[in-house]
């Protein structure tokens, strides 16, 4: 439900601005992919699959640790070795694999953090929509709003979601 669904819908949506068809937004795209993983958990897909649940939790731990390492390197001036050591200690992954990750973060600041930031924004928007709409909240409609605008900055996504739930509240008055 992650990248494939998001990119397929973007390709099918003819009325998107050209910039959204041609330029990918990391926080939106990777955020949607991670959100899809969280959604699977929220819907109970791992309830009868303890190994799948462990994989999900390990993936979430890795994503969170990447955010810390990315921020540590670019905001707090961690050395390459500090970032590698942190990732190895936190995730249990091999030093060689974590060195490759750290090298990627070094040349693409913010990219690793964008996964978690994007997913959290989508989750926050879903929870806000649920609070505002109560029993009128429809998960499918929410996903349609998130996906129908194509890749865009998270601030624009938030505006679209707010416009959607406000219009639903206005219709029910």
Predicted regions and their residues:
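N-terminal maturation segment of proteins
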Residues: 1-173
């Amino acid at each position: 439900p992650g990248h494939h669904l998001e990119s397929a819908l973007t390709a099918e949506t003819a009325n998107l601005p050209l910039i959204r068809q041609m330029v990918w937004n990391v926080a939106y795209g990777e955020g949607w992919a991670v959100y899809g993983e969280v959604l699977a958990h929220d819907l109970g897909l791992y309830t009868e699959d303890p190994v799948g649940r462990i994989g999900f939790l390990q993936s979430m731990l890795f994503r969170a640790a990447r955010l810390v390492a990315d921020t540590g390197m670019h905001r707090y001036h961690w050395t390459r070795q500090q970032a590698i050591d942190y990732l190895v200690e936190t995730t249990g992954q091999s030093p060689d694999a974590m060195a490759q990750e750290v090298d990627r973060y070094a040349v693409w600041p913010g990219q690793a953090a964008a996964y978690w930031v994007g997913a959290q924004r989508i989750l926050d928007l879903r929870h806000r929509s649920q609070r505002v709409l109560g029993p009128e909240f429809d998960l499918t409609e929410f996903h349609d709003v998130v996906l129908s605008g194509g890749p865009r900055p998270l601030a624009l996504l938030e505006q679209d979601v707010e416009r959607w739930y406000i219009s639903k509240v206005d219709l029910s008055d």
